């Protein structure tokens, strides 16, 4: 498998950073005296040194379970590419797919909800065609990435089954604990401003209500987990909306992640390497987003 195909399957996620700006400094570079003499001495004075301390979880990728069949992984080429890139996170089961996903009964149909009364189970795909929780966690261990598991907060609200949704999330946490999977980071839904989320777009306040219904129960089960929220793909231009979210659910959110996809749907590996920062999706670049 070539890297262009890898790029088409895995999408980047930027999570966060901190900046440190020390005071001015002076650096002197000197060539060997025996070669060129004192005239070669160069002094460079800098008004400021800009240093950034970034999280080793800054860059991650999606595993879209409904689009990444098991056959994709058998050769080992894709797994090796992931190890070579060394992402901080591998996210599962995907983005918008997470708003439809029921981990105990994956159907392979990423944008359809098993809880929909009109859902036809005859359309389910064989489980050997897609990655399940155990296969995902095995991949995480082999690649050295941090697991990032999604919680479906949408289905319960859409179908008036909120408590069932919470119990589903708690069973997933218990399953991971019982299997020895150490999962610290959990993301809630995905970009619910988009209309293709399960139940359609929701306001920041409504998303906050969804988070509040789940997170206290999850942290009661495991107080050490970190909750990741994401109402919109970007943050810098949506501060007002995020203020609305924080007003409702800030006490239950530990991290906000932002999503930057280089040339969505068309990018190649070579284009990604050639354009840094890559900034054609949603206007700016990941660099300006986290600046």
What are these regions (language model features)?
Residues 1-5:
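Positively charged n-region of N-terminal signal peptides that target proteins for export
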Residues 258:
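Histidine-centered catalytic micro-motifs
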Residues 8-19:
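Bacterial N-terminal signal peptides
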């Amino acid at each position: 498998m070539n890297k262009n195909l890898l790029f088409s399957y895995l999408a980047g996620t930027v999570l966060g950073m901190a900046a440190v700006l020390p005071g001015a400094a002076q650096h002197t570079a000197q060539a060997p005296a025996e070669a060129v003499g004192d005239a070669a001495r160069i002094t460079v004075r800098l008004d400021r040194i800009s240093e950034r301390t970034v999280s080793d979880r800054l860059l991650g990728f999606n595993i879209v379970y409904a689009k990444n069949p098991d056959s994709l992984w058998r050769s080992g080429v894709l797994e090796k590419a992931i190890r070579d890139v060394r992402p901080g996170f591998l996210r599962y089961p995907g983005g918008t797919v997470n708003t439809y996903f029921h981990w105990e009964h994956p159907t392979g149909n990423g944008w359809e909800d098993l809880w929909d009364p009109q859902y036809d189970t005859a359309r389910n795909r064989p489980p050997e065609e897609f990655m399940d929780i155990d296969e995902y966690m095995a991949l995480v261990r082999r690649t050295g990435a941090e697991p990032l598991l999604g919680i479906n907060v949408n289905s319960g609200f859409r179908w008036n089954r909120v408590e069932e949704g919470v119990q589903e999330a708690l069973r997933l946490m218990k399953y991971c604990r019982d299997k020895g999977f150490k999962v610290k980071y959990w993301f809630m839904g995905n970009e619910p401003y988009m209309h293709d989320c399960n139940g359609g777009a929701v306001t920041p306040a409504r998303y906050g209500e969804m988070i509040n219904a789940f997170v206290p129960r999850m942290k009661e089960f495991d107080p050490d987990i970190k909750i990741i929220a994401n109402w919109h793909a970007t943050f810098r231009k949506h501060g007002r909306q995020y203020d609305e979210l924080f007003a409702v659910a800030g006490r239950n959110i530990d991290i906000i992640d932002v999503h930057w996809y280089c040339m969505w749907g068309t990018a190649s590996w070579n284009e990604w390497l050639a354009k840094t920062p890559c900034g054609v999706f949603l206007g700016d670049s990941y660099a300006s987003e986290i600046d």
